[in-house]
A protein has these predicted regions:
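Transmembrane-helix bundle segments that line or gate the permeation/cavity pathway
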Residues: 49-159, 173-176
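Hydrophobic alpha-helical membrane-insertion segments
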Residues: 85-102, 251-260, 321-328
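TerminUS-proximal long segments
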Residues: 10, 14, 115-117, 297-302, ...
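Hydrophobic cores of alpha-helical transmembrane segments in multi-pass inner/ER membrane proteins
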Residues: 55-63, 91-96, 136-148, 210-225, ...
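N-terminal regions that are enriched for targeting/export leaders
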Residues: 1-55, 124, 386, 391-399
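Long, contiguous internal "core" modules enriched in hydrophobic/ aromatic residues
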Residues: 9-31, 124-294, 311, 381-384, ...
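Juxtamembrane "helix-exit" motif on the non-cytosolic side of transmembrane helices
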Residues: 31-39, 190-197, 334-342
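Non-cytosolic membrane-interface motifs at loop->transmembrane helix junctions
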Residues: 41-49, 76-78, 196-209, 280, ...
Length: 399
């Protein structure tokens, strides 16, 4: 080994605190199931999609990094790998969605799907609980297998300095990324778009793909800022590493805005009743103010700030912006999902706040546990020497 790259002891304390928060808020959230069963599952779905997005977005960025061979990915690879190893947890946490499908999805109600021949055909061929559950099982099988192979070969590369593992990871990254995009697209249709079985959008799935990748990248930047203040990453990470991550975050912010605006423009220009029905409740009754906030704080504000090279090189400032993006990712997701349950106007229930904290505590505890299990740097990677050759300057030095 070329040095001690074990995770700092603070990661263990982080795990304990996250677990305590997760357990306490899970117990509080569980009480909500007895008070309002429907609201419980509505809040659960939003929280689930948010944290699953970070796990799957991390897998997407991990595959992208291996595919492109970018040196920017060496310092964040172990953070990404740890996040992908939480996917089995999300598979288990999907079970309540199946159990509560009748409270979540209108297509589980026969009277709803018998209104038109088109809806009856959808229910017969696609929107039915057995097929819905089977597709979810297939998605998770693909995601877990892909994450398992990437982590297995990375672990073997730590043990044996063999370039064969680098080639294997690159070989699977192309098909794996394509398969991930396809499965996430279908999953977003199943889990989110089918909340309104009358409505469809060909851009909706891609919007989820980009949004989840953006969530994951912002989360990675937050974790890297935490690790950079401590050994061993304090002597490895340089301002240019954060600049590379900032550039990538700017690209994802722009891509998200492009797809979101494209979908809105197509629906607005078509002005067809079956298409505008999705946007109408989201632009009225208080939801419109949320939409404006998303435009400004999810796109305009981050876009303008990320144009600054000095901000991207400053870890303190960049992590604050990453935190804002993580918050706005949840707000945007809530804006996309919640109006289906309260189309009459903006409404926030206490379970909408408790659910993401409960699930987030459990997810972060598993993430921290996985992060502490392996060295923070893949020491036998072919790019190791070139990336770490220069003596680093403190990542927070630039202002």
């Amino acid at each position: 080994m070329n040095g001690n790259y074990s995770a700092p002891t603070e990661v263990g304390r982080w795990q304990q605190r996250a677990l305590i928060i997760g357990v306490v808020f899970t117990l509080l959230f569980a009480m909500g199931a007895f008070l309002d069963r429907s609201q419980f599952f509505h809040s659960y779905l939003v929280a689930y999609l948010f944290w699953t997005g970070i796990a799957l977005g991390s897998l997407a960025i991990l595959l992208l990094q291996h595919l492109t061979g970018g040196a920017w990915g060496l310092i964040i690879r172990r953070v990404l790998e740890a996040a992908t190893r939480t996917i089995p947890l999300m598979a288990v946490l999907f079970i309540p969605i199946i159990l509560g499908a009748h409270q979540i999805y209108p297509w589980t109600h026969h009277d709803e799907m018998s209104k038109t021949p088109a809806l009856e055909e959808k229910a017969r061929l696609y929107l039915n609980l057995p097929f819905f559950s089977g597709r979810a099982a297939l998605y998770f099988a693909i995601w877990i297998l892909t994450a398992y192979l990437m982590n297995k070969w990375s672990r073997e590369q730590d043990r044996i300095a063999d370039r064969r593992f680098t080639k294997l990871m690159r070989m699977i990254s192309g098909p794996g990324l394509l398969l991930l995009v396809l499965t996430v697209t279908f999953a977003s249709v199943d889990w989110a778009m089918s909340l309104n079985p009358d409505w469809f959008s060909t851009i909706y799935g891609l919007l989820f793909v980009i949004a989840w990748a953006l969530s994951a990248l912002a989360f990675v930047i937050a974790v890297m800022s935490f690790l950079t203040n401590r050994e061993p990453m304090s002597r490895i990470v340089r301002p240019n590493h954060f600049q590379d991550l900032g550039k990538l975050m700017l690209a994802f912010v722009m891509l998200w805005a492009y797809f979101a605006f494209s979908q809105f423009l197509i629906v607005w220009s078509g002005n067809l009743p079956e298409e505008i029905q999705w946007y109408l409740p989201r632009l009225r009754g208080g939801w419109g103010a949320i939409a404006v906030a998303v435009v400004f704080f999810h796109f305009a504000f981050p876009f303008l700030l990320l144009l600054s090279a000095s901000l991207k090189r400053n870890a303190r400032k960049l992590v604050m912006l990453a935190g804002l993006i993580i918050l706005m990712r949840f707000v945007d997701l809530f804006w996309m999902i919640a109006p289906e349950f309260s189309p009459e106007g903006f409404h926030v229930n206490w379970m909408d706040v408790v659910a993401p904290i409960a699930m987030g505590g459990l997810w972060l505890a598993v993430f921290a546990w996985q992060l502490s299990k392996r060295p923070l740097i893949p020491i036998n990677d072919p790019q190791y020497d070139s990336v770490l050759a220069q003596a680093p300057a403190p990542a927070h030095a630039d202002h």
